[in-house]
């Protein structure tokens, strides 16, 4: 069954974001496939997309990162700290993490690598 984004779903998400109802946001999005959430984030403005991204756990958002349009991914990454980006990369396969880290500036790349928990993973990424 193909996922369809409804206007009602977008409005509900926008209302939950406005009310900072993180728990209900998680409940609503938790069972959705990461590709479907990426589609939803693409329909929201950058602030709303970033808000949802920060509410969800890294296990889910790492996979979402891979599905996002380049400009949205770049915008969300620009709003995350090096530590938050490292948490995302720690959840990804080496080749996927390498693709994402390649999009970062040299300075940010160095900071993110220093934050990675798995030293072997960090070596393989760069």
For each of these PLM feature ranges, what is it?
Residues 1-126:
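Hydrophobic packing positions in regular secondary-structure scaffolds
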